[in-house]
A protein has these predicted regions:
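A helix-coil-helix interface module used to build multimeric assemblies
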Residues: 1-187, 197, 205-207, 270-274, ...
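Glycine-rich cofactor/substrate-binding loops
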Residues: 1-35, 278-490
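Amphipathic alpha-helix face/heptad-repeat signature
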Residues: 29-32, 53, 57-60, 122, ...
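Charged/polar positions within long, soluble alpha-helices
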Residues: 41, 45, 66-70, 91-94, ...
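Conserved hydrophobic residue
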Residues: 48-49, 262-263, 399
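Internal glycine-rich alpha/beta core junctions
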Residues: 81-99, 128-131, 160-309
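Glycine-rich cofactor-pocket loops
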Residues: 142-164, 265-281, 312-319, 346-359
């Protein structure tokens, strides 16, 4: 109001529009402050703002910088988060200094700069949390590399395997997500500051200097693309939907394993919840939390993709993303932290898992393999023969022995075969079958231990990178504030 408009926003617009934008303030506050400080410094260094007014502007910005995000007086009636900061700045240093904060940039620029800074750090934190989960699974799996278990498909007993091999089934997708977030984080290394409206500015603003002040190694070259690019954020949300799906699969499988019918795993009490009505129950509440996040992450991606269908340079895009991205980053980190804690804290009942493997005929495929390798039957025929043996056992009971298999071969294929008793005994032993896997990545104990070491090493590498990235960002932020204090004479 006071320029192009003759009236302020309606109550309805404040509630539906500015309320949403102001709500993004706390999550973006620190990065918005860094954006404002860098812009003021660039204006002063470029000669666009004299030292006296520049120092006054910086003093006011440093005062705002010292306010904790949730202590700042965000007011939707004032407008978005930048307008709230601008009002507070004006109250502290007056319009003669505060009025220069928007020289050479629209108010959307500090949001774009802030969102990139928040996203880059959040991706590092999410990568670290996911790597902690994969590391926890590898730690659980290694001592159980040779412990017998039954693998399941369609919730039906399938083949003999080991507990360690089953646990690693969850570790690799989670680790890939951690490594994916590390790669995607590189898309936010370019600075979008100093581009003016959308085609540059006549103000003496050095974009490369702004990038340096903000800790970016390069600039996003095209001015309009820099200001409005949304595809990197879609990749972030896609990555979270993928990572959440992997964690949801872990949670769903684990809930089945925790059931009384399976009894393979027991969650730690700290990740469980009692029933308000039935005192005997120990509910795996943490797993429900994880699955809920997966649904939210998928919905977030869908909402963003739908919103981005509007044309280029539309306010819709970041009206959504300014709030959605920080929330998604926080949810990804804390959900992965919970999943890592669940993985590290769960107790595995190896005796029950072995019992399941020995009670179910999980060696059927191995017996078929043995027949094809030691008799005249081809594999497909051997498969049919063993299928007939299983059906006969289900209908009539009894043990599976050489005579029964030979009779089935004659009935199914008209073949006369002699089944080696020693070969059959070995093929019927699930532990022997699980160990007899020569391929890379199999359930062979040495292969499982090697995979555990690989997951542990890659997880540690991601965590080390994340810690270095977070530390580098903090160092850059402190250097920026030190420069601001120097120019402000503080």
């Amino acid at each position: 109001m006071g320029g192009r408009l003759t009236a302020g926003p309606s109550d309805e617009l404040v509630r539906a529009g500015y309320g949403t934008e102001a709500a993004a303030g706390p999550a973006l506050a620190d990065a918005l402050s860094r954006s404002d400080l860098a812009h003021a410094i660039a204006l002063i260094e470029g000669g666009g703002l004299d030292a006296e007014r520049g120092s006054e502007l910086l003093r006011g910005l440093l005062e705002l910088d010292a306010i904790a995000p949730h202590d700042f007086p965000w007011d939707p009636a004032v407008g978005d988060a930048f307008q709230n900061r601008e009002k507070e700045l004006t109250a502290r240093v007056g319009s003669s200094a505060a009025g220069w904060l928007s020289a050479g940039r629209p108010r959307r620029e500090p949001f774009r700069v802030a969102l990139r800074l928040v996203t880059a750090e959040g991706l590092a934190r999410s990568a670290a949390a996911f790597s902690d989960m994969s590391a926890a699974l590898a730690t659980q799996a290694k001592p159980l590399a040779g412990s017998l278990a039954a693998d399941y498909t369609y919730l039906q007993p399938a083949q003999p395997t080991t507990v360690g091999h089953l646990l690693l089934t969850w570790a690799f997708p989670v680790l890939r997500s951690a490594e994916r977030y590390r790669r995607v984080q590189g898309d936010f290394a370019g600075s979008v500051a100093g581009v003016g409206g959308s085609a540059g500015s006549r103000w003496p603003i050095n974009r490369e200097r702004l990038a340096d002040l903000l800790g970016h190694p390069r600039v996003e070259v095209h001015a309009k693309d820099a200001m409005w690019q949304s595809d990197p954020y879609l990749e972030v949300l896609s990555g979270f939907a993928i990572g959440a799906t992997s964690i949801s699969q872990f949670a769903q499988d684990l809930e089945i394993w925790c059931s009384q019918e399976f009894g393979w795993v027991e969650l730690d009490d700290t990740h469980s919840r009692v029933s308000a009505l039935m005192p005997q129950k120990k509910n795996p509440y943490a797993l429900a939390v994880l699955r809920t996040w997966a649904g939210q992450a998928t919905g977030d991606l869908t909402a963003a993709l739908t919103t981005m269908h509007t044309g280029a340079a539309r306010t819709d895009h970041f009206h959504l993303l300014n709030g959605l991205i920080p929330r998604s980053l926080a949810e990804a980190e804390r959900s992965a932290q919970l999943a890592a804690a669940v993985a590290a804290g769960m107790a595995i009942n190896t005796a029950r898992m072995e019992q399941s493997a020995r009670e179910a005929f999980v060696t059927a495929a191995d017996v078929a393999d043995m027949l094809a390798q030691t008799t005249s039957l081809d594999y497909r025929t051997a498969h049919h023969v063993i299928g007939r043996v299983v059906r006969d056992q289900v209908e009539h009971g009894g043990e599976i022995d050489a005579a029964r298999i030979a009779a089935a071969a004659n009935e199914v294929a008209g073949a006369e075969i002699v089944v080696d008793e020693a070969e059959l005994a070995a093929a019927l032993d699930p532990a022997a079958c699980a160990a007899l896997r020569p391929q890379t990545g199999s359930s062979d104990a040495d292969q499982v231990r090697a995979m555990c070491d690989d997951v542990a090493a890659r997880s540690a590498e991601v965590r080390c990178w994340a810690e270095e990235a977070i530390a580098a960002d903090a160092k850059s932020a402190e250097a920026l504030r030190a420069k601001a204090r120097e120019l402000a004479g503080a």
